[in-house]
Amino acid sequence: MTILNHTLGFPRVGLRRELKKAQESYWAGNSTREELLTVGRELRARHWDQQKQAGIDLLPVGDFAWYDHVLTTSLLLGNVPPRHQNKDGSVDIDTLFRIGRGRAPTGEPAAAAEMTKWFNTNYHYMVPEFVKGQQFKLTWTQLLEEVDEALALGHNVKPVLLGPVTYLWLGKVKGEQFDRLSLLNDILPVYQQVLAELAKRGIEWVQIDEPALVLELPQAWLDAYKPAYDALQGQVKLLLTTYFEGVTPNLDTITALPVQGLHVDLVHGKDDVVELHKRLPSDWLLSAGLINGRNVWRADLTEKYAQIKDIVGKRDLWVASSCSLLHSPIDLSVETRLDAEVKSWFAFALQKCHELALLRDALNSGDTAALAEWSAPIQARRNSTRVHNPAVEKRLAAITAQDSQRANVYEVRAEAQRARFKLPAWPTTTIGSFPQTTEIRTLRLDFKKGNLDANNYRTGIAEHIRQAIVEQERLGLDVLVHGEAERNDMVEYFGEHLDGFVFTQNGWVQSYGSRCVKPPIVIGDVSRPAPITVEWAKYAQSLTDKPVKGMLTGPVTILCWSFPREDVSRETIAKQIALALRDEVADLEAAGIGIIQIDEPALREGLPLRRSDWDAYLQWGVEAFRINAAVAKDDTQIHTHMCYCEFNDIMDSIAALDADVITIETSRSDMELLESFEEFDYPNEIGPGVYDIHSPNVPSVEWIEALLKKAAKRIPAERLWVNPDCGLKTRGWPETRAALANMVQAAQNLRRG
């Protein structure tokens, strides 16, 4: 029984973000569709070859996507919302982009589909839309074309397909309500057709992803798996693939399925591999997800070997990444600025492929010398002074309940804030960032490369901040922001100014579509050596009589959008960050900044996948925010911002944050999210986002007014703010001006009644 290895997927954006650049060039009309498609082909060929050279036996095909893999699946099934369809009924790459962005180089603009997080990761997908009586047919053959490409290149191919039950689980019903699970029998023939096409191509194994099987699913959904897979069996071998959690709670459902193998995440799940082996059918292949696909740390391969060795030779076995390597940067070897000690602690996607090759070879030969050599830096890290800071650990241990309590309740604070700011009804503001123009990015890049001295850099940033203030005053906004010209990324910027973080040059991972982020890496105890945002906030406030918000990224979001340490709990990291940012709140307040926004867009996405684990997470997540904010005086108004969220199941925790104002993403869901706040009788102020910043479409005054009137039916108007869904960093100035002018006009119209 020779053990093979494989990955569940590979990063698709390219080491230098080639995919992002090609997409954005195409969207802007600067390149042709064929040029875009060529970049995709080149990236796929390169990535297959890189994995093969690193020692991977079975290459994933179908993990590439032009926007996200759920949207690719929607097109595969012919599930295109009517508003995005071509007049002739055909489907092309612009159809896909219209669903994702609301517009494309061809076709009529229409509201983009809703976007949300992929399970508990920082990757997003476009939510499939389902209507009653919907028909499905094989429409978009990208998967088959890519399999043909890989076969022509001589690769050992393992196609990757999102499973039918998970696909339905991830979607939403539009219009007349019905049970979307009832569509299962309608989509299965398309899956059968795809599997038949793969069988024709001589494919032996298909990786069929059903990550919903790690959730606490309703019984009806669990019951749907057996008939679904009964319908899919027989054409190729199916590797039922799960990740992000363990499968033991749903193992009875899984073992009844007519599949030939099971992939389990042995990093994030608590499954005991020997017990799994005992319970799985003896003729099934077990794919052991031993290498963390979601982090950047070098694996302790001696530990991984010990974890799996007891079942070697007892069944067919593959070793694999825990999940797709999509969530990891591509290649550590191109990082030239990390010092040697720290660099030795990491492994990116290609290094993880090498780890899988080392592990496979050791399991097949019994020789573990190479594993011990690879794992040596991990032992050194455990004792490094780069990791441990006694002062931070002492301060954390000294936290009391008082440290997470504002001096007075919201009603008392609100009165003090009204007296201080004297804002009109329907106060207008933005979420924080303004367009990151080419000039701003060039300025930052020149400074980073040493082509610009500090004085000229600061002068340039100051001018962009001044322009942002002038623009906002001209538009008539009530509460201003400084625009964040100095920030490349809302998490990276803070990480760069906090001890305990390191950064990469090319550690890009995809967030959604063409958006890539370069997450900081938490390597040690976190502290703040000096004020971070105070100077620019104070400067911006000096330019205007209107209040300017101080802008902080909250502790849970910094944690969730970084690669965390694995040697301490997430709670410990979050509270260390909270203490560091607590000092920043105090310094902003002392500098005369009266409104401070602490963004926590990641609070909900950090939830464990199983509801039974939620309470513990929410308890420390809320406490971290409150530790951060509670130092503020009564007349300092604390805002928070959240996006892409379903709030109804965590409203207690949202209220427990005790922010004076919460701004939320609501426009894509047509204010649906406000139902949660209405039903809960949320006591503080709310700014429901009135337009979708992820789309370049400019909303009309009438559209915004209608949304605000809808909001006022749920939340008393005196507690409503008017703002976009999210920051405006990715938009251009012309559409930003137009959209904000309409937003301000809508607010003024409502004030006049």
Curated annotation (Swiss-Prot):
Zn(2+) binds at residues 641, 643, 665, 726. Pathway: Amino-acid biosynthesis; L-methionine biosynthesis via de novo pathway; L-methionine from L-homocysteine (MetE route): step 1/1. L-methionine binds at residues 431-433, 484, 599. 5-methyltetrahydropteroyltri-L-glutamate binds at residues 17-20, 117, 515-516, 561, 605. Binds 1 zinc ion per subunit. The active site is at residue 694. One of its GO terms (molecular function) is zinc ion binding. CDD domains: CIMS_C_terminal_like, CIMS_N_terminal_like. The keyword Nuclease does not apply. InterPro entries: Cbl-indep_Met_Synth_N (IPR013215), Cobalamin-indep_Met_synthase (IPR006276), Met_Synth_C/arc (IPR002629), UROD/MetE-like_sf (IPR038071). It is an enzyme of class 2 (transferase). L-homocysteine binds at residues 431-433, 484, 599. Its cofactor is Zn(2+). It comes from the Bacteria. Keywords: Amino-acid biosynthesis, Metal-binding, Methionine biosynthesis, Methyltransferase, Repeat, Transferase, Zinc. GO terms for biological process: methionine biosynthetic process; methylation. It catalyses: 5-methyltetrahydropteroyltri-L-glutamate + L-homocysteine = tetrahydropteroyltri-L-glutamate + L-methionine. Its EC number is 2.1.1.14. Coiled coil: none annotated. Catalyzes the transfer of a methyl group from 5-methyltetrahydrofolate to homocysteine resulting in methionine formation. Belongs to the vitamin-B12 independent methionine synthase family. This is 5-methyltetrahydropteroyltriglutamate--homocysteine methyltransferase.
